Amino acid sequence: MESKETVRIGGRRSKLAVVQSEQVKVMIESKFSHIECPLLSVHTLGDQVQSKPLYSFGGKAVWTKELEDLLYKDDESRIDLIVHSLKDMPTLLPDGFELGGITKRVDPTDALVMPIGSPYSSLSELPDGSVVGTSSVRRSAQLKRKFPNLKFESIRGNIQTRLAKLDDPETPYKCIVLASAGLMRSGLDSRITQRFNADTMCYAVGQGALGIEIRKDDEKMKKILKEICDPSTTICCLAERSLLRTLEGGCSVPIGVVSNYDESTKVLTLKGIVINVEGTEWVEIEHKVTISNEREDSINCGKELAAKLTQNGAKEILDSINLDKIT
């Protein structure tokens, strides 16, 4: 029997990350019968340090560095690709690495989750001073804009840990906010009380999609990934990431997006919001382009929207954000 070719997949060790790695494994193995994909799960700094809010880390390498080191190992721990939640991938990767592909996006929205048995079904029903748990300043800033009567506090941990904290009878949280996609991929759709629409909350860049990181110029991996990645999602997410990169915002900065690509008209619509941490100042603009060259036009769309936002005060908002980061 002919031995199979091996493509080693790396990912974080959380339950959700393992599910995501397994999804990519299935995609590749179902397209290529001669390939098998063993999985390697790794604890990253972001997994290990649970006592600090995410914004204090200052950047996204907190989720990626340990895995990136394995792409260039010369022993049995070497991997060929890394599966990330795209929203956690830095928009500027270190030398020697590149974004090899983006999978089809599932629901990109943010979700409100109430404790089991809660009498409430929306933020507008909560009593003044109720505590909302979220690890994201993007979420808390946008919600403060709409619900200044509520309090927002950090909550860390994987999805199961956060849900356990929420459901604890002694919990300080009246509700928490999570990515809809993470709940769906974890089989926890039933915990979603409400999905926020774009009027209330723009989602994170890349949210709901998986980004696959590879060694730079690894043509073999590029050919494999081309077969499992989604063109429409790629167009939207390249534009979103270009916007974020041009504005120089990391995952710790309140920048939200909403994007849509119409395959029939080839029109890409990208909306961006830059908002201060307090939710009192913001700039929100929508931009449309017709796509002819998928990569080039998508990236330019993000750059053009970034320029519009900057012209309307986004830079001043971002410059005013002074967060206490880990040095």
From Swiss-Prot:
Its cofactor is dipyrromethane. Coiled coil: none annotated. The keyword Lipoprotein does not apply. Signal peptide: none annotated. Gene3D superfamilies: Periplasmic binding protein-like II, Porphobilinogen deaminase, C-terminal domain. Belongs to the HMBS family. Tetrapolymerization of the monopyrrole PBG into the hydroxymethylbilane pre-uroporphyrinogen in several discrete steps. It comes from Kluyveromyces lactis (strain ATCC 8585 / CBS 2359 / DSM 70799 / NBRC 1267 / NRRL Y-1140 / WM37). Its EC number is 2.5.1.61. Pathway: Porphyrin-containing compound metabolism; protoporphyrin-IX biosynthesis; coproporphyrinogen-III from 5-aminolevulinate: step 2/4. CDD domains: PBP2_HuPBGD_like. Pfam families: Porphobil_deam, Porphobil_deamC. One of its GO terms (cellular component) is cytoplasm. GO terms for biological process: protoporphyrinogen IX biosynthetic process. The porphobilinogen subunits are added to the dipyrromethan group. The keyword Zinc does not apply. The modification S-(dipyrrolylmethanemethyl)cysteine is found at C251. Binds 1 dipyrromethane group covalently. This is Porphobilinogen deaminase. InterPro entries: HemC (IPR000860), Porphobilin_deaminase_cofac_BS (IPR022419), Porphobilin_deaminase_N (IPR022417), Porphobilinogen_deaminase_C (IPR022418), Porphobilinogen_deaminase_C_sf (IPR036803). The lineage of its organism: Eukaryota, Fungi, Dikarya, Ascomycota, Saccharomycotina. One of its GO terms (molecular function) is hydroxymethylbilane synthase activity. Keywords: Heme biosynthesis, Porphyrin biosynthesis, Transferase. NCBIfam families: hemC (TIGR00212).
